[in-house]
């Protein structure tokens, strides 16, 4: 794990003659002491430093159940929504919108389909016929052969770079469960595990915090590799306990239900420690969040 430290704490640097750089031998001897001191100094002793656009989103341990979140993939982005975390489409969302959200200290997550492509995707032609599978349950979207990392990696890397360039600090990996569907390829559990871990590693290499969307049957194996989870309808499907590896590791779980009322499901999801809300299936701006505990 890399620890990002602010360039300085407190007020502006003093003027005067610059200090002479230490010799290489002195620097080597001083390094252990500097590291120890860094780990011992309380972080609240420093002034808050805004996270730069290319830095991974930090997820404070155990705070998710006290957060509100928004998941919007259709319609004009409503930047006025009172939410701490925004999950958005990186293609449709403009840099001006992400800049406004960052100005309001919101945490930004882009959604990237890593195991599928749509005919309307700007980069759809980059996927050769050999990796294009059968249709998913959504119009004009098809599964990909996730065993072909050599083909998928460069396309996914560019999708992640788009997120980073627009100021997102995290990425939610959607359609990461093709093995559990009729994808058109003989995908197995281990094929999917290998791919999902590779994608998480790729996201980190491009300074994005990786999150897993659904794929509940692999959560126990993948929770150590991901920083957060996004789930749809675990209450309706009676599968919320599958997400405990994330909450027990003090990692956020962002949850949504499309049916029922918050009065009926919030007791369950907030009890699990999820950040939870009700949405319509088109994932427009409307939301009905669970009350904070």
Stretches with model-predicted labels:
Residues 1-7, 17, 22-50:
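Secretory targeting and sorting signals
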Residues 13-15:
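Interdomain coupling and dimerization elements in large ATP-driven molecular machines
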Residues 50-293:
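Glycan-processing catalytic domains of CAZymes
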């Amino acid at each position: 794990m890399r620890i990002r430290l602010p360039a300085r704490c407190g007020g502006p640097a003093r003027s005067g003659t610059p200090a002479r750089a230490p010799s290489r031998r002195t620097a080597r001897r001083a390094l252990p002491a500097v590291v120890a001191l860094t780990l011992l100094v309380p972080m609240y002793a420093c002034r808050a430093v805004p996270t730069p656009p290319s830095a991974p989103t930090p997820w404070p341990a155990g705070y998710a159940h006290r957060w509100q979140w928004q998941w919007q993939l259709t319609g004009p982005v409503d930047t006025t929504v009172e939410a701490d975390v925004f999950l958005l489409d990186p293609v449709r969302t403009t840099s001006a919108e992400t800049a406004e959200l960052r100005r309001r200290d919101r945490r930004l997550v882009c959604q990237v389909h890593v195991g599928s492509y749509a005919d309307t995707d700007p980069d759809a032609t980059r996927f050769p016929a050999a990796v294009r599978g059968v249709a998913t349950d959504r119009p004009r979207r098809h599964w990909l052969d996730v065993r072909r990392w050599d083909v998928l990696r460069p396309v996914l890397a560019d999708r992640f770079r788009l997120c980073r360039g627009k100021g997102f600090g995290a990425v939610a990996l959607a359609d990461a469960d093709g093995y559990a569907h009729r994808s058109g390829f003989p995908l197995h559990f281990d094929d999917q595990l290998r791919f999902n871990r590779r994608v998480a590693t790729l996201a980190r290499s491009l300074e994005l915090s990786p999150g897993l969307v659904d794929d509940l049957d692999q959560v126990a194996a993948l929770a150590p590799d991901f920083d957060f989870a996004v789930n749809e309808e675990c209450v309706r499907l009676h599968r919320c306990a599958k997400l405990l590896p994330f909450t027990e590791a003090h990692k956020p779980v962002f949850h949504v239900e499309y049916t029922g009322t918050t009065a009926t499901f919030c007791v369950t999801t907030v009890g699990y420690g999820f950040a939870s809300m009700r949405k319509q299936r088109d994932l427009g701006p409307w939301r009905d969040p669970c009350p904070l505990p």
